[in-house]
Structure formats: structure tokens, C-alpha cells
């Protein structure tokens, strides 16, 4: 099982760089490309409810993915950047991210299955196959992305949290020692 893999000291900065770039790739390139190909492959000239639902489902998925990735970019990465500076937010930790982290690649599987099952075969079948191929690749890419988050990024951030907490405890003890010496001197 992946949870039994030994901890390896990884660069949290390199992981965040990879994850941020992956977010931009998905949101700014891969998904817009799929949508463009999807529009080319489906027949929007007819009043086809399946076509409308496929587009609506895809657009809803993209919005959900944007929300998910923007949360990570704005909150999770900011939290980790502060940790790297030795600043620990007492109201947040990486376990909160883990508890709320949903795997958004499942909806792509649903979309692919809806297209395969309900979209009528037409003269643009090759184009739709290209769309399905892109969706399949996105599924795999997002699954890999989630594995990097779950099995590399989260354990690395947990280790960083531990180090920052230990450092804060050590600094607190060191700060209290001179006070104790002063109190002993003044009581004598």
C-alpha cells in the first residue's frame, strides 16, 4: 500500500511548483482544448438534449475543478509558503486539506461514460473519439496529480508542520529560560 511507503525528504517548493504548473496546464490548456474539440465533434445545429447535457456537464465540471484548484492555490499553498518562513497558522493545518480533498477526476469518468452511452454515432465519430481520448488522458493526468498531492505533497507538508512546531517549542523554551533565571535572582 502507498501509505506504507517510507518518508523521503522532498522539496516542498519543487512539489508546489509542479502542482501550480499542473493547475495552469489543466485550467488554461487541457480543458479548454477538450471543450473546443467537444464543440467541433457534437452537432449543435440540432435541438439535441444529450448535446446540451454533455456541454452543461463538462462546463459544470470545469467550474468545480477551477474552484478546487483555486482553493489549493490561494489557501493551501499560501499556508505552506508561510510554514516555510516558520509561520504556523493555528487555525489551519494540512489535515484539514486532506479531510476536504475530493478527487475530481471521477467526474471525467462520468462524462466519458455519458458520451459513450448516450451520444449518437454520427459523421464526426473520429472527432468524438479524439475527444474521448483527451478525456481519458485527462483522467489519468488528474489521477496522477491527486497521487502527487496525497502521497508526496501531504506527507512533506506534515513533516514541515512538525519541524515548525518543534522549532517554535524550542524557541519558547529558550525564551523562558532567561526569565526563570531573572526570577531566581530577584527572589534571592
Model feature map: region roles:
Residues 1-188:
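Small-residue-biased structural context
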Amino acid at each position: 500500500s502507498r501509505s506504507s511507503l517510507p518518508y523521503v525528504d522532498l522539496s516542498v517548493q519543487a512539489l508546489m511548483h509542479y502542482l501550480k504548473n499542473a493547475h495552469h496546464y489543466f485550467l488554461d490548456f487541457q480543458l479548454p482544448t477538450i471543450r473546443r474539440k467537444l464543440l467541433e465533434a457534437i452537432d449543435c445545429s440540432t435541438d439535441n438534449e444529450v448535446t446540451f447535457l454533455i456541454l452543461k456537464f463538462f462546463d459544470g465540471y470545469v467550474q468545480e475543478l477551477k474552484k478546487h484548484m483555486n482553493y489549493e492555490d490561494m489557501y493551501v499553498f499560501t499556508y505552506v509558503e508561510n510554514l516555510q518562513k516558520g509561520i504556523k497558522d493555528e487555525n489551519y493545518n494540512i489535515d484539514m486539506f486532506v479531510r476536504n480533498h475530493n478527487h475530481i477526476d471521477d467526474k471525467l469518468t462520468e462524462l466519458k461514460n455519458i458520451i459513450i452511452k448516450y451520444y449518437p454515432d454520427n459523421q464526426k465519430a473520429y472527432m468524438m473519439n479524439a475527444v474521448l481520448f483527451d478525456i481519458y488522458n485527462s483522467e489519468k493526468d488528474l489521477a496522477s496529480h491527486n497521487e502527487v498531492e496525497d502521497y508526496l505533497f501531504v506527507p512533506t507538508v506534515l513533516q514541515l508542520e512538525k519541524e515548525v512546531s518543534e522549532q517554535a517549542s524550542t524557541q519558547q523554551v529558550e525564551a523562558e529560560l532567561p526569565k526563570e533565571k531573572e526570577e531566581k535572582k530577584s527572589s534571592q
